[in-house]
């Protein structure tokens, strides 16, 4: 199935049942992948309003806020994502990067270390090692 066909199928499913959180998330992921941030943001926010404990929505919404330079909001989303799943290495990485961009290096350090522990062979482990010292 092509991405455009999948998006159409998710839209149709949401017409039939606007509370299908999985369809909202999957459609948001498609928009995010196309760099359609406003559409993706609205869908993630709607999914969170229906099911507040959906990790992926918080993490991806944090990525959107980060991409938009809205670091305080990104930080809040990443913190909530970590509350829901403290073992996802990329959340620690992006929270650390966000804290650094906000001038909060001390706050970033434990997340750099967590990233290294959770993803010892991760693509950003050298960067994390430099910042965590």
Short names for language-model regions:
Residues 52-66:
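Short, structured interface segments that constitute the first stable element of a domain
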Residues 1-12, 22, 33-46, 56, ...:
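Structural signature of tandem alpha-helical TPR/SEL1-like repeats
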